[in-house]
Amino acid sequence: MLRDTMNSWNDSQSDLCSTDHEEEEEMVFGENEDDLEEMMDLSDLPTSLFACRVHEAVFEVPEQKERFEALFTIYDDQVTFQLFKSFRRVRINFSKPEAAARARIELHETDFNGRKLKLYFAQVQMSGETRDKSYLQPPQPAKQFLISPPASPPVGWKQGGDATPVINYDLLCAVSKLGPGEKYELHAGTESTPSVVVHVCESETEEEEETKNPKQKITQTRRPEPPTAALSEPRAFDCAL
């Protein structure tokens, strides 16, 4: 009985271990598949290659040109070629980035007419929107005219109309009732504050004020004259020889 229970316990433990190993393998392989899919994503790669240091016969001999093009037509039937004889380069344009990547991996540094073929990916041409997003944008000129006035008004600026002047008609009416020589109490005084009284002047022009209150003139002091006796008498100089 004890032997049977031990055998059953060992069988259960082995089943548990096998299931754990299977789950771990599934998790590992599942993660590896996701990583492989991410690594095999070739959508960002360019679809063109540049072949550098190409043999001169490719540009001059039609048979060598056909032989060179046959190397790349295996990967893509719709491939096109652009020959730059002065630079000894050929641009190979594929229809898919996968074909360009395979040709780059398999044909790079292979011998062609006694020379190693150098293959490089062409630079990806960015559109206008992506090119603008790759650089830091200047701030929006919404409130820059508040810092310094611009040469021309900003977009959407409209000149505001002048506000109508505020006229206090009650004040004008009170001033018109004032007469010369009289005083008017505006605010009555209290125990802690004095009263405010307005005295109206009798004269209305400055000329009348000057005639009634003439300005005091300051007489300048006369300069003293030199004595006449000192100027009239001749001076004698004694000279002994």
From Swiss-Prot:
| Region listing for Calcineurin-binding, in residue ranges | 183-203
* Chain residue ranges for the region called Disordered: 1-22, 201-241
Bias kind Polar residues: ranges? 1-17
- GO CC annotations, alphabetized: cytoplasm; nucleus
**Transmembrane parts of this sequence:** none
Entry GO MF terms: calcium-dependent protein serine/threonine phosphatase regulator activity; nucleic acid binding; phosphatase binding; troponin I binding
Q: A single GO BP annotation from the record? A: calcium-mediated signaling
Q: How does it assemble?
A: Interacts with protein phosphatase PPP3CA/calcineurin A.
| Physiological role | Inhibits calcineurin-dependent transcriptional responses by binding to the catalytic domain of calcineurin A. Could play a role during central nervous system development.
- Family the entry assigns: Belongs to the RCAN family.
Q: What is this protein called?
A: Calcipressin-3
From the broadest rank down, the organism's phylogenetic lineage runs: Eukaryota, Metazoa, Chordata, Craniata, Vertebrata
